[in-house]
């Protein structure tokens, strides 16, 4: 019996941290709550920088969210905006600049110019591989290029990609590959978008698309989000919520945004989300969320 336990322990050690997180995401019964750092550790380093990613990894998050744009010469770089104006010492649209030029720029924060440069997606993948999962935002239009980069690094399932595209459109991307990134539909439960997203939601639930999770955004203009949550959970997928700002998670009157969890209010915000069955949370205050989850025994990998 002891030798059996020893073998199990050795097997667990042989798995990378990323693989262990993936196993929890794939397990519908797991109560482990996956913490996603929005634009990585941007409170201490420039957003989407390698330093911010490293900071988030050391913090203990499960996934870093990064945004990608493609340069004039076809290189994917980690940048949220279509231009480099806000985040770097340069100017211009990413699509009209070369990767070499962008590599000469320095990233900026509200405090000023930093020592850090804008990384390529390749550099980000090499840093994160096996250590933390990645959520690539704004990436569906570059799906095949990203897939190739991941396959070369043997880390295809270490990336979550998402969109509000129709299942039939997504299927065209997935069908080209024998192994795909983890896919997540974005569903907006709002008065402004629900007319379109209601049939989108139904079509995903009825489709063969292997949706690992559903990102549900709601602003309080419609009632009944709990029914949407429950249907996601019943499907066997994970329920992903963004606690970044009010309009993504309940609206001003019933917001679950991170700032409302400050000053000892974690139970009222994060605790309620856990009761709703949320098991993936993208946060702008990942350390606050991690501390809370660990205090509740909801962030311990087997």
Can you describe what each PLM-predicted range is?
Residues 1-18:
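Bacterial Sec-dependent N-terminal signal peptides
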Residues 14-302:
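Phosphate-group recognition and catalysis centered on beta-loop-alpha active-site segments
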